[in-house]
A protein has these predicted regions:
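Conserved P-loop NTPase "ATPase switch" module shared by AAA+ and STAND
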Residues: 122-166, 183-184
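Conserved small helical "lid"/interfacial subdomain of P-loop NTPases
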Residues: 204-255, 264-265
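Short amphipathic alpha-helical interaction segments
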Residues: 354-370, 375
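Sensor-1/coupling segment of RecA-like P-loop NTPase cores
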Residues: 153-197, 204-208, 212-215
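Short, amphipathic alpha-helical interaction segments positioned at domain boundaries
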Residues: 387-404
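Winged-helix-like regulatory helical subdomains adjacent to P-loop NTPase cores
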Residues: 279-359
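The conserved phosphate-sensing helix
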Residues: 251-278
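Extended, compositionally biased accessory segments flanking or bridging domains
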Residues: 1-140
Length: 404
């Protein structure tokens, strides 16, 4: 595989043209492992299929206070600056698309870019406006020299009327009748619109996929900002998986291999890897119990001590909510529909699915109970820790999948 420039600076913010995007090393092997693990779990049961150096019963979840300390939210501002540099090379292009996978931050990045540039964001149409083919939101683009749409997936429905607006937008923009635009777009929405509407000639950029070494540096800096970094161990191997970012040692190389496994599982996407890191991070049972009791008795949550909370553990990345291999057609089509729309509210399902609202709701409820779906800001979407298995299932059944 071609060596990439990100190796020198370890930056997670390399912005590249879509055709230059490369998944991390061992991505295909990660898919094989996921399939094998699902098969052995089905045959032998979950306990027999897993051998862990540290059992989950010996660990516990971190408090929200501790999580906000060790794993703060991703700051997408550097990505917005990288987008600004890239767009300078497309001064003659009427539209530039920035795409990311689900949970990949495209809306936040483009919103930050708009704020940096002093450009107004175009608000999304309502569900009623989409189903009626309303074009008022397109007209709002035409009245500005520059315009921004942070999340294009909120501006269409896979519905006869629901595609009219985005078709009109692209026709006007590419013909030069609108000002210059920057659009954030879910990678699944992009794949669908490329197929249904056509996006030939539109420059498309994305963040380059990360390798394990880059994830190690990013998470080490995230956890150790302004203080002592924790030692994070793998529950699978018992070995440390975060090395001191100032060291170039054999121990560091071994730790990168473990995070390479996570990078491959997440296809190199920082947003999804961050969710794994936050959701799967644990501390030993009995760690700092007295300190916790004192905090609770005082009724005042405190920031965890970096000195007393140095030992943390990461549960196996592959042990997420997994789709059964015999997932039915209704559930599979629902998952694909949610992905190409970047998530949908319940009342929108009847407009975009070829079966009754009752069937759609039953499938949605079942997937939510399994942990495959989650509700975020009123919309049902594929949960971050289930995304890899959902994508693999859809690809295996020859559904249209995203390019990332």
């Amino acid at each position: 595989m071609t060596q990439r420039s990100t190796k020198t600076a370890f930056s997670p913010w390399e912005m590249v043209a879509l055709e230059s995007f490369q998944t991390p090393e061992h991505t295909q092997a990660s898919q094989w492992r996921r399939s094998w693990r699902a098969a052995t779990t089905w045959i032998m049961g979950r306990e027999a299929s897993e051998h862990q150096a540290k059992e989950e019963s010996e660990l516990r979840k971190l408090s929200e206070v501790a999580l906000s300390h060790w794993v703060p939210a991703i700051d997408w501002t550097p990505a917005a600056r990288a987008l600004s540099q890239v767009t300078e090379g497309y001064v003659d292009a009427p539209v530039v698309l920035f795409i990311s996978p689900p949970h990949g931050g495209h809306a936040a990045v483009v919103s930050h870019w708009a704020q940096q540039q002093g450009v107004n964001c175009i608000s999304a149409p309502t569900l009623n406006e989409l189903t009626e083919g309303c074009l008022e939101w397109v007209e709002r683009c035409g009245s500005q020299r520059q315009w921004v749409i942070p999340a294009l997936e909120r501006h269409f429905l896979r519905h006869t009327q629901g595609l009219q607006g985005v078709r009109e937008l692209l026709e006007r923009a590419l013909s030069g009748r609108l000002g210059q635009g920057v659009i954030g777009c879910d990678s699944w929405t992009y794949a669908y619109l490329q197929h249904a509407v056509g996006l030939e000639g539109v420059p498309v950029v994305t963040l380059q996929a990360l390798e394990g070494e880059q994830l190690a540096h990013y998470f080490a800096q995230l956890a150790g900002d302004g203080g002592v970094r924790p030692t994070v161990y793998s529950s699978r191997t018992g070995q440390p998986i975060l090395a001191d970012v100032s060291e170039d040692s054999a121990d560091g190389e071994r730790s990168y291999k473990e995070l390479q496994r996570l990078a491959a599982h997440c296809r190199g996407h920082l947003g999804i890897a961050w969710h794994y890191w936050r959701e799967r991070l644990r501390e030993p049972v009995g760690n700092d119990e007295s300190g916790r009791s004192q905090e609770q008795s005082e009724g005042q949550p405190k920031e965890p001590s970096k000195e007393s909370s140095k030992e943390l553990w990461l549960l196996d990345a592959l042990a997420e909510a997994e789709l059964a291999s015999d997932t039915g057609d209704v559930a599979t089509l629902l998952l694909h529909t949610l992905l190409i729309h970047g998530g949908l509210e319940d009342q929108a399902l009847g407009y975009v699915l070829p079966f009754s609202s009752h069937e759609a709701l039953n499938a949605r409820l079942a997937l939510a109970r399994q942990g495959i779906l989650r509700c975020h800001q009123g919309r049902w979407q594929v949960a971050p820790l289930s995304y890899a298995s959902v994508r693999q299932l859809l690809e295996s059944r020859n559904y249209l999948v995203d390019p990332l």
